[in-house]
C-alpha cells in the first residue's frame, strides 16, 4: 500500500500533519482535561476525578475548544514535542502512541469508524468524573490526597 492509500497516521510524522489531521487524532477520552498533580514524594503524576470546567463529562469533549484558552489560560497546548516528552499523557493517548512509534488502538475512532468506541472500550472518563464546578469536586481532590498521604489529612 502506498502512502496515499494508507491512513495518514500510519505514514505522516506528527510534525507534517495538517491541523485537521492533528485534531482528528484526539480520541475524545477526556483524560488530558482532568486536574492532575505531581506527587512530591514519588514524582508520579496523579490524575484526579475532577475535570476542567469546559469538559462536557458526557461527550468527553471541550465545550469551548477553539477559544478555550480565553477561559482556561493554562490549558495545555499539545504539540508533537509535547507528545514525545510529556509522560503525564495517558499511554492510550493517540498522540503519545504515535510519538512512541506505536499505532492507534483498535478502539480509536479513526480505526473503528465509531466515535463511541472510545467510551465502549472504557478508555474515556465518561461517567467517572465530576466538573470542577461541581460542589463535589473539592471532596474528590481531598480524597485523592488522603489516599496518597494518609497521615497528613485535615479532618
From Swiss-Prot:
Pfam families: CxxCxxCC (PF03692). InterPro entries: Puta_zinc/iron-chelating_dom, UCP006173. NCBIfam families: PRK05170.1-5, PRK05170.2-5. Belongs to the UPF0260 family. HAMAP family: UPF0260. This is UPF0260 protein Mlg_1382. It comes from Alkalilimnicola ehrlichii (strain ATCC BAA-1101 / DSM 17681 / MLHE-1).
Amino acid at each position: 500500500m502506498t502512502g496515499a492509500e494508507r491512513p495518514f497516521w500510519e505514514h505522516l510524522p506528527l510534525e507534517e500533519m495538517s491541523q485537521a489531521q492533528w485534531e482528528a487524532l484526539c480520541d475524545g477520552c477526556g483524560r488530558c482535561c482532568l486536574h492532575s498533580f505531581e506527587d512530591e514524594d514519588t514524582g508520579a503524576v496523579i490524575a484526579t476525578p475532577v475535570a476542567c470546567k469546559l469538559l462536557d463529562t458526557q461527550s468527553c469533549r471541550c465545550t469551548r475548544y477553539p477559544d478555550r484558552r480565553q477561559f482556561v489560560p493554562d490549558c495545555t497546548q499539545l504539540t508533537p514535542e509535547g507528545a514525545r516528552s510529556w509522560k503525564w499523557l495517558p499511554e492510550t493517548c493517540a498522540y503519545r502512541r504515535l510519538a512512541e512509534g506505536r499505532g492507534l488502538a483498535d478502539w480509536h475512532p479513526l480505526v473503528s469508524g465509531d466515535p463511541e468506541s472510545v467510551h465502549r472500550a472504557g478508555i474515556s472518563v465518561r461517567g467517572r468524573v465530576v466538573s470542577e464546578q461541581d460542589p463535589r469536586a473539592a471532596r474528590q481532590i481531598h480524597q485523592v490526597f488522603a489516599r496518597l498521604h494518609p497521615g497528613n489529612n485535615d479532618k
